């Protein structure tokens, strides 16, 4: 049953009643939500608007059969903005699942390799694509890296913090121990294909909230087995930043 948690949600529900009806059918039985925020946040580049965690939680809380809403987010240690964001997520009453972001140093030092060597570039370009490069392309890229080296830049930092193991584990635990009937995953990552396939095989309802062209083919292929993909464009005004509301 739907009961708006805020006046804005109530107004929007009156404006888009069919969206609410559709979601009431989706959130069928005991429902848990799993939000892979590192996957969700970049969607704004394509969507042209942002998912607001506070408004999203208020919207989800308006459906009384939604139980746990897990929010997976990597925290940058000793980073004030990152730690404050995690604090806010807890304040919104999400079940926050977090761990430190790993920061990896990747060498871009080409000063001791031949100009036509792919030894450094191969760490950033996948093999099948690298094989398509002409020697001139490799030489050009190495020359660009050498210019950075001359400026004293010998490595770059890359951040990594995946939650595919934790999310897959939590979904299966909720199935085995907590009698969850409907599993709603906010992600389009191929890493979730196996746990989703298992849940579908066990006759559970799985809904993928994502956006067009951000769903891996492995997940798209599970639609024939019952996976439902819901385009979050349909609920833009319910979950976007307030300043991005259409009206």
State what each model feature region is.
Residues 2-140, 152, 156, 200-214:
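Domain-level signal for Mg2+-assisted phosphodiester chemistry and nucleotide/NA-binding surfaces
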Residues 98, 103-247:
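Nuclease catalytic cores that cleave nucleic-acid phosphodiester bonds
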């Amino acid at each position: 049953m739907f009961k708006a948690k805020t006046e804005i949600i109530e107004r929007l529900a009156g404006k888009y009643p069919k969206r609410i009806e559709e979601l009431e059918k989706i959130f069928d039985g005991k429902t848990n939500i799993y939000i892979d925020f590192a996957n969700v946040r970049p969607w704004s580049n394509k969507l042209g608007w942002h998912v607001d965690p506070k408004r999203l939680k208020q919207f989800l809380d308006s459906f009384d059969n939604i139980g746990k809403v897990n929010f997976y987010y990597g925290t940058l240690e000793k980073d004030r903005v990152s730690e404050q964001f995690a604090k806010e997520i807890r304040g919104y009453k999400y079940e926050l699942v977090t761990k430190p972001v790993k920061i990896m140093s990747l060498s871009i030092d080409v000063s001791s390799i031949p100009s036509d060597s792919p030894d450094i570039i191969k760490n950033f370009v996948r093999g099948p694509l690298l094989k398509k490069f002409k020697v001139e392309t490799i030489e050009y890229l190495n020359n660009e890296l050498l210019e950075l080296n001359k400026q004293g830049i010998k490595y770059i930092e890359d951040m990594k913090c995946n939650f595919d193991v934790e999310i897959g584990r939590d979904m299966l635990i909720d199935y085995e121990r907590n009698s969850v009937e409907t599993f709603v995953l906010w992600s389009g990552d191929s890493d979730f294909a196996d746990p989703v396939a298992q849940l579908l095989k066990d006759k559970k309802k799985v809904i993928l909230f994502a956006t067009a062209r951000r769903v891996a083919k492995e997940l798209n292929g599970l639609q024939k087995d019952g996976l439902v993909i819901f385009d979050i464009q349909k609920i833009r005004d319910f979950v976007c930043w307030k300043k991005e509301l259409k009206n």
